[in-house]
């Protein structure tokens, strides 16, 4: 059987993989087999950490909102604020509330006070 030379197709495939791993250290940027393994591992980690990043930012926003709310009143907390927001049907997400808590605390206090007044008034009237 005659030998078939792969030519430029295999070389092009390998150079494309090598360009991806050019910033890796040691054999991870030189040997084709380890480059492909590290590429798969890097893409898996990137996919996992994109979801993880969303979770971490949500936790950070919740912590910031809770810290700002509890600073004002001991009896009021993050969970009650979010519950009252849903009762009033206000569309303020956690990211926006965290930005308000950092940049303008008085605005957040005004929002929470209005919500407390409205909810307590509705509960007292029946």
Swiss-Prot record:
PANTHER family, alphabetized: 39S RIBOSOMAL PROTEIN L20 (PTHR10986)
An example GO BP is:
ribosomal large subunit assembly
What CDD domains does UniProt report for this protein, alphabetically?
Answer: Ribosomal_L20 (cd07026)
> Signal sequence: where?
none
Q: Which InterPro entries match?
A: Ribosomal_bL20, RIBOSOMAL_L20_CS, Ribosomal_protein_bL20_C
Q: Which gene encodes it?
A: rpl20
Short name of one Pfam family: Ribosomal_L20
The entry sums up its family as follows:
Belongs to the bacterial ribosomal protein bL20 family.
What subcellular compartments does it reside in?
A: Plastid, Chloroplast
Physiological role: Binds directly to 23S ribosomal RNA and is necessary for the in vitro assembly process of the 50S ribosomal subunit. It is not involved in the protein synthesizing functions of that subunit.
One GO term in the molecular function aspect is:
structural constituent of ribosome
Q: Which UniProt keywords apply?
A: Chloroplast, Plastid, Ribonucleoprotein, Ribosomal protein, RNA-binding, rRNA-binding
Specify whether Plastid is a keyword of the entry: yes
- Designated name of the protein: Large ribosomal subunit protein bL20c
Which Gene3D superfamilies does this chain map to? 6.10.160.10, Ribosomal protein L20 (1.10.1900.20)
What does UniProt give as GO cellular component?
chloroplast; ribonucleoprotein complex; ribosome
Q: Which domain of life is it from?
A: Eukaryota
């Amino acid at each position: 059987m005659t030998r078939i030379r792969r030519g430029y197709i295999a070389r092009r495939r390998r150079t494309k993989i090598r360009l991806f791993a050019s910033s890796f250290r040691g054999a991870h940027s030189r040997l084709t087999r380890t480059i492909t393994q590290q590429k798969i591992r890097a893409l898996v980690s990137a996919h996992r950490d994109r979801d993880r990043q969303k979770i971490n930012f949500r936790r950070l926003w919740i912590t910031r909102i809770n810290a700002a709310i509890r600073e004002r009143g001991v009896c009021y907390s993050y969970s009650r604020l979010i519950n009252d927001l849903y009762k009033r049907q206000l569309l303020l997400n956690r990211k926006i509330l965290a930005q308000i808590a950092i940049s303008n605390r008085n605005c957040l206090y005004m929002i929470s006070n209005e919500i407390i007044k409205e909810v307590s008034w509705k509960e007292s009237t029946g």
